[in-house]
Regions:
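Cytoplasmic-side transmembrane-helix entry/capping segments in multi-pass membrane proteins
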Residues: 2-11
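Hydrophobic alpha-helical transmembrane segments of multipass membrane transporters and ion channels
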Residues: 12, 16-20, 78, 119-131
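Alpha-helical membrane-inserting segments
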Residues: 16, 20, 24, 86, ...
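P-loop potassium selectivity filter motif centered on the GYG triad
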Residues: 20-74, 138-187
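Non-catalytic accessory segments adjacent to catalytic cores
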Residues: 66-88, 118
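Juxtamembrane interface elements at the cytosolic ends of transmembrane helices
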Residues: 81-114, 126, 143-147, 183-202
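Long, contiguous internal "core" modules enriched in hydrophobic/ aromatic residues
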Residues: 111-151, 180
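Conserved small/polar residues in nucleotide/adenosyl-binding loops
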Residues: 205-209
Length: 209
């Protein structure tokens, strides 16, 4: 399983996931145009944050949740997410998928077992997600709002559930989200090295070109 095949698999998986992800928008009637639904989904999975919706508050809670959740999945990468769930065979298969998709560590230098590393990355990702969720609840943000906000923050795409985005929330909540926008924006290789008890390597590491 070569690098080129890994890249093709990643590209095809993105296309399939995006088409499947647009189905909830169409079935709910929230977006009736298939192209618009696909645009919204691709924007979510790629964490671009662009939207064709003029207002989001009229949307059903289930659709708002799904819209934000696409950011959370896309934040670490759809294929890395699948690697955590699917028992794929062949180290070369894992290696090239991870290399083509992951925003985390350089698999050729730091990662002996790619599927295990994918699980570690998502474990760290989930840990930060839970931390932000709890801090938002402490600030008396409603549970649903907190959950959707965390997904949008983790993916760094910024999908919100209010028409004014985050303008109606308190200074404390804005501060929490600001801090976690920075934390989620940091290269996950830094967290990975700390997890592996190699903090000094963080200063020596440079992202592969």
């Amino acid at each position: 399983f070569y690098t080129r095949e890994g890249s093709v698999t990643v590209a095809l998986s993105w296309i399939v996931m995006s088409i499947m992800g647009s189905i909830p928008f169409l079935l709910s009637g929230s977006i009736t145009n298939p192209v618009d639904a696909l645009f919204e989904t691709v924007s979510g999975f790629t964490t671009t944050g662009a939207s064709i919706l003029p207002a989001v508050e009229p949307l059903q809670h289930g659709i708002l949740f799904w819209r934000s959740f696409t950011h959370w999945i896309g934040g670490m990468g759809v294929l890395v997410f699948l690697l955590c769930l699917l028992p794929l065979t062949g180290s070369g298969y894992h290696m090239n998928l991870m290399k083509a998709e992951s925003p985390g560590p350089s698999v050729t230098k730091l990662v002996p077992k790619v599927q295990s590393t994918a699980k570690i990355l998502y474990g760290l990702y989930l840990f930060l997600t839970v931390m932000e969720f709890v801090l938002l609840l402490v600030g008396q943000m409603p549970v649903f709002d907190s959950l959707c906000t965390v997904f949008g923050t983790a993916g760094t795409g910024g999908f919100g559930i209010k028409n004014d985005s985050f303008g109606s929330y308190s200074t404390y909540l804005q501060g929490v989200v600001t801090v976690f926008m920075i934390l989620f924006g940091i290269n996950f290789n830094v967290y990975f090295l700390f997890y592996m008890k190699k903090p000094k390597d963080c200063l020596l590491y440079t992202s592969p070109s």
